[in-house]
Regions:
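Phosphate/diphosphate ligand-binding glycine-rich loop within oxidoreductases
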Residues: 1-71
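Short loop/helix-cap segments at secondary-structure boundaries that form the rim of catalytic
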Residues: 7-13, 28-35, 108, 120-129, ...
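A short helix->loop->beta-strand "cap" motif at the edges of active sites that frequently abuts
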Residues: 12-16, 35-38, 113, 171-173, ...
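Phosphate-coordination loops involved in phosphoryl transfer and adenosine-cofactor binding
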Residues: 37, 88-92, 163, 172
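Glycine-rich NAD(P)-binding loop of Rossmann-like domains
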Residues: 70-103, 130
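Residues at the starts of beta-strands that form the adenosine-phosphate
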Residues: 91, 113-114
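Rossmann-like adenosine-cofactor binding region
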Residues: 122-216
Length: 222
C-alpha cells in the first residue's frame, strides 16, 4: 500500500502483513486505528532509490551553480556572470543516512562534493564525515553549505527544518527537502530566505499537498 484511507487497514479482518511501497512508513502510522500487532515493513525499490539520487543530484547542482540567479538574470535580460565554484569547493550535509541517504551520498561523492551525514545513532560510511545525535547536530549544521533532508518523519523530526536549524547553517546556505512536508516549518523558511540566512531552497514535499494556489512559496524567487 501507499497511503490507504484511515480505518481501511483496521477493517481487514485477515490482515497479516502490510508492505509500504513508499520510502517510509509514517504515512501509514498516522492512522490511529492501524492495528499495531500487524507487522509493517517498507519496500526497498531500486527504481525509487535511483529516482531519489537523480533528484538530489539535480537539486544540489541547481543550488551550488546558483541557477536561481542565472534564471533571474535571463528573465530580466541582464548579462551577468556568476562565480563558479566546483563541487570540490562545497560541503554538503545529508540529514538521514539510511538506504536513500547513503545512495545519494555515494553519488555526490562521485561528483567531487565533500559530503557529511547526520543520523540519530552512530554510523560509519566510506568517504562521509558522519555526525550523530543532538551533540553532533550543531557542528554538522555549522558546516553544511547545502543541507539535504532525507529523514523519516517521526515525532522527533517533525519541524526539524525550522528557525533553529536555519540559524545554525552558514550564511547563504541552500536547503533541499526531499523527505516529508512535516519536516519543514514553511513560515521559518520564508523568513530565512527573506533575510538571506538561506540563499535558496528546493522543495519536493509540502505540509499541504497540493500546495494551495495562494501559498507564498509559489511566488518566492528563491
Amino acid at each position: 500500500v501507499w497511503e490507504p484511507p484511515q480505518g481501511l487497514l483496521a477493517s481487514l479482518e485477515n490482515l497479516r502483513l502490510v508492505i509500504s511501497t513508499g520510502a517510509g512508513v509514517d504515512h501509514i502510522l498516522r492512522d490511529p486505528s492501524y492495528p499495531r500487532d500487524v507487522p509493517l515493513v517498507r519496500m526497498v525499490d531500486p527504481g525509487l532509490t535511483q529516482g531519489m539520487i537523480e533528484y538530489v543530484v539535480m537539486a544540489t547542482l541547481l543550488c551550488t551553480r546558483r541557477m536561481h540567479r542565472t534564471f533571474a538574470h535571463q528573465a530580466n535580460r541582464v548579462w551577468q556572470e556568476e562565480e563558479v565554484r566546483l563541487a570540490t569547493d562545497h560541503k554538503v550535509g545529508i540529514m538521514g543516512i539510511g538506504v536513500l541517504g547513503q545512495a545519494c551520498a555515494s553519488a555526490l561523492i562521485g561528483m567531487g562534493y565533500n559530503v557529511m551525514g547526520w543520523s540519530r545513532s552512530p554510523k560509519r560510511l566510506d568517504g562521509v564525515e558522519t555526525y550523530h545525535g543532538i551533540d553532533g547536530l550543531e557542528k554538522f549544521l555549522n558546516r553544511s553549505e547545502v543541507l539535504i533532508c532525507l529523514l523519516p518523519l517521526t515525532p522527533d523530526t517533525e519541524g526539524i527544518l525550522g528557525r533553529g536549524t536555519f540559524n545554525r547553517l552558514p550564511q547563504g546556505a541552500a536547503v533541499i527537502n526531499a523527505g516529508r512536508g512535516g519536516h519543514m516549518v514553511e513560515e521559518d523558511l520564508l523568513a530565512a530566505l527573506d533575510r538571506g540566512r538561506v540563499e535558496v531552497a528546493v522543495l519536493d514535499v509540502f505540509r499541504e499537498e497540493p500546495l494551495p494556489g495562494e501559498h507564498p512559496l509559489w511566488d518566492h524567487p528563491r
